[in-house]
């Protein structure tokens, strides 16, 4: 069984918040919600893949060597709504008790990620407000060396394209293994996506109908394969998508294609 490590698509919900007077209010509820359970379950549905799903704060808090071990022991790593700061910063940088006591540096997770993919680890880069360039540029992937392993090019401005009417996908490379047995015409509309540019040498497998922007693109970088899906595999953008009858098949196909490239 092949191993998948899925980072992102968790949230902490605080509330509801009640205000009894002008001076007193209280949050009366706290919940951890894994919006990634649809993708996790889809990938595990065929019995070919075992998925570990973690929130971004687990990734951010990893000790030196922990992330490297994950990359060494997994076939696919997924990033969804994981802004660049989670790669570039470390909690110890904000520990005031350490200021002025020793040199604070850690392995560069961006470089580690790029080198891992080129060495044979396969990766999915999935959309959201904090993916690609993201809301107000918060995603920031294109401003880091992650751009070397993205099968699309990020915009330099906010890239969110949203509509209450939704956007439908259409196939471009209809014979690509990722689309085997799928009919994208039956895929429900998504409520948003990240606008990106096609990258030379990286096939666009599907695009957003009437928009022309890539929906799915793939690439080979060294020994590893990369996939970009520019909408969200989870709500809210994907609140209709997750109930698509072929949702699990799409992601199973994607994982099979990633791991069939001669890498890990």
Residues covered by each model-derived region:
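An acidic, glycine-rich "communication" segment
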Residues: 1-2, 9-19, 23, 36, ...
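Generic recognition of flexible, low-complexity loop/linker segments
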Residues: 65-66, 111-113, 192-193, 214-217
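Extracellular ligand-binding/catalytic regions of CAZymes and related secreted enzymes
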Residues: 1-12, 18-19, 69, 122, ...
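Sec/Tat-exported extracytoplasmic proteins
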Residues: 78-81, 117-121, 150-154, 254, ...
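Active-site-proximal beta-strand/loop segments in catalytic clefts of secreted hydrolases
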Residues: 7-10, 56, 80-82, 126-129, ...
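Acidic/polar loop patches that form or flank catalytic/metal-binding clefts of enzymes
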Residues: 53, 157-158, 263-264
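A structural signal for well-ordered alpha-helical segments within the folded catalytic domains
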Residues: 33-37, 144, 248-252
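Helical hinge/lid and interdomain linker segments adjacent to catalytic or ligand-binding clefts
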Residues: 24-140
């Amino acid at each position: 069984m092949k191993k998948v490590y899925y980072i992102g698509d968790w949230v902490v919900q605080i509330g509801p918040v009640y205000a009894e007077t002008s001076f007193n209010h209280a949050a009366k509820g706290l919940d951890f919600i894994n919006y990634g359970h649809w993708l996790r379950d889809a990938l595990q549905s065929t019995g070919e893949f075992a998925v570990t799903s973690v929130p971004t704060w687990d990734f951010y808090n990893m000790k030196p060597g922990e992330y490297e071990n994950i990359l060494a022991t997994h076939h696919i790593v997924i990033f969804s709504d994981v802004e660049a700061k989670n790669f570039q910063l470390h909690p110890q940088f904000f520990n005031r008790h350490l200021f002025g006591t020793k040199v604070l540096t850690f392995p560069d997770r961006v470089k580690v990620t790029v080198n891992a993919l080129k060495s044979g680890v396969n990766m999915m880069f999935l959309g959201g407000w904090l993916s690609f360039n993201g809301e107000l540029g918060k995603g920031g992937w294109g401003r880091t060396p992650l751009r070397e392993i993205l099968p699309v090019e990020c915009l330099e401005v906010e890239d969110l394209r949203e509509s209450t009417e939704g956007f439908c996908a259409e196939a471009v490379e209809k014979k690509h293994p990722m689309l085997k047995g799928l009919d994208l015409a039956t895929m429900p509309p998504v409520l948003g996506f990240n606008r990106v540019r096609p990258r030379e040498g990286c096939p666009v497998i599907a695009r957003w109908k009437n928009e022309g922007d890539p929906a799915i693109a793939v690439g080979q970088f060294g020994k590893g394969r990369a996939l970009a899906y520019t909408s969200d595999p989870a709500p809210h953008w994907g609140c209709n998508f997750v109930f698509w009858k072929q949702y699990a098949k799409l992601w199973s196909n994607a994982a099979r294609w990633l791991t069939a490239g001669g890498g890990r």
